[in-house]
Amino acid sequence: MTATQYMPYLDVYVSENYNVLSRIVWSYDSSGVQSKKMFGSLYEPILMCTKNKNSKYTFNYNDIMIEAKTGSQRKLIDYRKKVPAPYNTKKVPGNVWNFNRVRFKMDEYENHPTQKPEALLERIVLASSNKDDIVLDPFSGTFTTSSVAIKNGRKAIGMELNDEYYKIGIRRTGISNTYQDEKLQKDKSRKTNNRSKRSTITVSSKVDQIQLSLGDEFAWEILLKIF
């Protein structure tokens, strides 16, 4: 099952145990593999939630403002105000986000079948964290979240099962350009197999890093304690 198919079940669980603030749709321009038996999926769901209704959370709306569609690029004046002023041409994004999927020829492409675009994760990181905060991604893939977090002055904790993706992570986060005497370079080949026998936790910032290899059960135990 895909993330889109799982979401109804996850939504019910999260709604019963947490406080859902927003249900976001990431809309993209291609469904990838074309099916002749059903409609192709052109979106992925995202839940924004807190532990409970009393939880304090960060929402930096000023850091994620986008251009408001006014129908014209000229300066518009709002005469409804006591002192006429230019219309605000910026607005907070709604809950439907349009970002293209990562394609093979893009500079940010890494060898992963479901890589998320940096622009998508940057919006989430900027909105929900402040500088020097720690951003956790327990299913890191190519470590785009961690990479974006560090670029924007945050620290990052990334967790990943696959050794090859882990190598991508330590390269993208700037921890090292080598791994066990292997020089790490971007691989521009097509998608890899998404499996591994071990978990790796990486804690990284600009000045320090910790790397731990863990068994799957222990990794999940840590996740449960974190959340």
Annotated model-derived regions:
Residues 167-227:
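PRPP-dependent phosphoribosyltransferase catalytic core
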